[in-house]
From Swiss-Prot:
Gene that this polypeptide is encoded by: pyrE
Organism: Cereibacter sphaeroides (strain ATCC 17029 / ATH 2.4.9) (Rhodobacter sphaeroides)
Protein name as it appears in the record: Orotate phosphoribosyltransferase
Pfam families reported in the protein's UniProt record: Pribosyltran (PF00156)
Binding site residues for 5-phospho-alpha-D-ribose 1-diphosphate: R107, K108, K111, E133, D134, L135, T136, T137, D138, G139, G140, S141
Family the entry assigns: Belongs to the purine/pyrimidine phosphoribosyltransferase family. PyrE subfamily.
Length: 232
């Protein structure tokens, strides 16, 4: 059933953050930072893939995603819902079910040849495709999926994620320059606010996380490993 009532954005963000904290998808470790794929340190880590194992929370968040898309993009904005391999696939299927639309997924690498070599499922020329993923940091990884969709002759002007970092100011501009609008449920700032309200982490940890969120580049530069090729 297509939802027709729209909870306030702030309430969606707060409840999404609360659910992520409840299933322990959120990790704060400023004293022993995580290492990102870029090699840079981060005191924060989030695992949205855990959501598929919590049916009640998963269902609620997909309802939130559906109403966010209907409110912000429109009731007849899409013809096809595409998940990005791998994390986006289950969420794309759930969103497609709620919106009553076909579902496909986009491979990271091509399989075979032709303009549909990265697409699994039926995607046709002229379709308006929504790209669904679990999260985005700076938006960069989404562009490859968008390009693969457009190579089929379909259009892709929107991407939706459960979690958007919300700390790198270039993200929205990068996506907009590629003709893509980002839709999301919550950010690190929403998680930080809910973590403070619930007492999920100690005050010192939250203060250090806030320092990172306020200026992630400076925080990382101060803590990134020394270059072993440089002599003392």
């Amino acid at each position: 059933m297509i939802p027709t009532s729209f909870p306030p954005r702030e309430e969606i963000a707060r409840l999404t953050a609360r659910m992520l904290l409840e299933i322990e998808a959120v990790h704060f470790r400023p004293q022993e930072p995580f290492t990102l794929a870029s090699g840079l340190p981060s005191p924060t880590y989030i695992d949205c893939r855990k959501l598929i194992s919590y049916p009640r929370i998963r269902s609620t968040l997909m309802d939130f995603m559906a109403v966010t898309l209907l409110r912000d993009a429109g009731f007849e904005a899409f013809d096809n819902i595409a998940g990005g391999e791998t994390a986006g696939i289950p969420f794309a299927a759930l969103v497609a079910e709620r919106l009553g639309l076909p579902m496909t997924y986009v491979r990271k690498k091509p399989k075979g040849y032709g303009r549909n070599a990265r697409i699994e499922g039926v995607m046709t020329e002229g379709q308006r495709v929504l790209l669904v993923e679990d999260l985005t940091t700076d938006g960069g990884s989404k562009l490859s999926f968008v390009d693969a969709i457009r190579e089929t002759g379909a259009s892709c002007a929107h991407t939706a994620v459960i979690f958007y970092y919300g700390i790198f100011p270039e993200t929205i501009g990068r996506l907009q320059a590629h003709g893509v609008t980002l839709h999301h449920l919550c950010t690190w700032w929403d998680v930080l606010a809910e973590a403070r309200a619930s007492g999920a982490f100690d005050a010192g940890t939250l203060a250090e996380v806030e320092s990172f969120l306020s200026n992630p580049r400076d925080w990382q530069d101060a803590r990134k490993p020394a270059d072993p090729t440089k002599s003392l």
